[in-house]
């Protein structure tokens, strides 16, 4: 396991590492209600598509454990309300809704009594937790076929252990390459406006001893022109049926720069991030956040009072800019419509 854990179930509470305070301070916060977990997701105490899905799963466990309902129908109604609250916390990441729906499916049997619902939900949440570690590690192992023995890569946002239960997706690829003895150097986009690259990815890679350099988001194209970059590695929050990718704002710009310079652009994600119910990225709901994330840094104003802002948290990268999608079931190549359908049908 990593030297830090983004989330941990204590037996009665969900402990979250408050990522807003990193790297300056390591603070843990404890939650005992689904509403509290939903607020933590919205406030980005915990972030990253896989991590918020697992956090939401334990949010339902908390609702069940604290419920005074002895009638199973009443308990299910209470859980349904909590589920909608959790899903609404961050609408772009499909893993959040996927994890909540999987939890509800686990208790779909109408014959389950209240006590059995409690036990089933806890087991289902723990299974999600354990699966996430195994899935992320497999993504990292599968990707090594694309990473040369000596590699310079560009990474956007944070997709490591802090964004998941452990290892992570795109950053996990870098971590595993380093563990395997590859000479890998990561250039980390700082990732405005919340600086997940500078604050979180640099924090992780420093802990693992992986050589890295932080760059401003606008420097990636010039960096590709100035020196050899072997690939760009990003995670994602949703992949649509045609292979369009929703990821942290700035991903689209990076993909355009990579295309212009002939640099492979790889997206790493678990199968749970694939949403074939949406035909293209145009159908994805994009979360817009408070403009103060742009006009302030850690509470300090950096723009004139009253400045207008537009602050989408994510953007859409068209499938034609994506060289490959790396999953726990293998590496997918265009045409993505066919590849995504096949990987969902055939687990092997």
Curated annotation (Swiss-Prot):
An example Gene Ontology molecular-function term: S-methyl-5-thioribose-1-phosphate isomerase activity
Keywords: Amino-acid biosynthesis, Isomerase, Methionine biosynthesis
Domain of life assignment: Bacteria
This enzyme's EC code(s): 5.3.1.23
InterPro entries membership: IF-2B-related, IF-M1Pi, IF_2B-like_C, Initiation_fac_2B_a/b/d, M1Pi_N, NagB/RpiA_transferase-like
One GO-annotated biological process of the protein: L-methionine salvage from methylthioadenosine
Catalytic reactions of this protein: 5-(methylsulfanyl)-alpha-D-ribose 1-phosphate = 5-(methylsulfanyl)-D-ribulose 1-phosphate
Annotated active site: 237
Pathway(s) of this molecule: Amino-acid biosynthesis; L-methionine biosynthesis via salvage pathway; L-methionine from S-methyl-5-thio-alpha-D-ribose 1-phosphate: step 1/6
Family as reported in the entry's similarity comment: Belongs to the eIF-2B alpha/beta/delta subunits family. MtnA subfamily.
Role according to the record: Catalyzes the interconversion of methylthioribose-1-phosphate (MTR-1-P) into methylthioribulose-1-phosphate (MTRu-1-P).
Protein name in UniProt: Methylthioribose-1-phosphate isomerase
Organism encoding this protein: Synechococcus elongatus (strain ATCC 33912 / PCC 7942 / FACHB-805) (Anacystis nidulans R2)
Gene: mtnA
